[in-house]
C-alpha cells in the first residue's frame, strides 16, 4: 500500500472512530485526547488530517452528506424506494441526525476558518438536491399531484427531522412503543402525502 493509500485508510479509520465516540459521548464529551488514545495514535498525527475539533465535526458531516449523494447516484430504484432509503438512513441513526444538525447550525453561526469546508458541504448538498428535484418532479407528475416539489421535499425533511428528534428523545421515546412500527408509520405518511393533493380529473364531455 502506497503512502497516499495508507493516509486515506488511516483517515477513514479516524473518522469512523471519531463518529462513534461523538455519538457515544456527545459533542462536549468527545475530546481529541480520547480519540488519539482510542486509535493509539499521537495527537500530532490527528492534526495531519484536521486542524481542530470543529473541523473534524464538519468533515464528519461532509462525509455523511457525501454518503447521501452517493446513494442517490447509485440507487436505481423508483422514487418510493429512494424515499425509504433516505428516511431510514436518518431514522435508524436518530442520534447522528439530531447531533449533526445541531453541530452544523452551531458552526455555521460562529465558527471561524471553516468557509472552505462549508462551501464543500453546500456543493455536495446542492448536487444531491439537483438530482432529487428532477426525480421528485417526475414522480409527482406521474401521481397527478398538485403539490409542488419544494413543498413535498420540505415535508419529507421536516417529518424526518421531527421523527429523528422523537426517536432520540429520552422523554418521547417512552411513549412511542415499537420504534420499528413508528418508522414505518412515518414513512407511510410521506408516501401517502401526494394522494392528498391529487389533481381533479376533468369529467368526460
PLM segments and residue spans:
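N-terminal intrinsically disordered/low-complexity leader segments
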Residues: 1-9, 143, 198-205
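Hydrophobic/aromatic-rich alpha-helical bundle segments in the mid-to-C-terminal region
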Residues: 140-187, 201-205
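Amphipathic alpha-helical packing segments from all-alpha helical-bundle domains
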Residues: 69, 73, 112-142, 150-154, ...
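Hydrophobic alpha-helical connector segments
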Residues: 59, 70-96, 149-156
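Alpha-helical DNA-contacting segments of helix-turn-helix folds
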Residues: 56-64
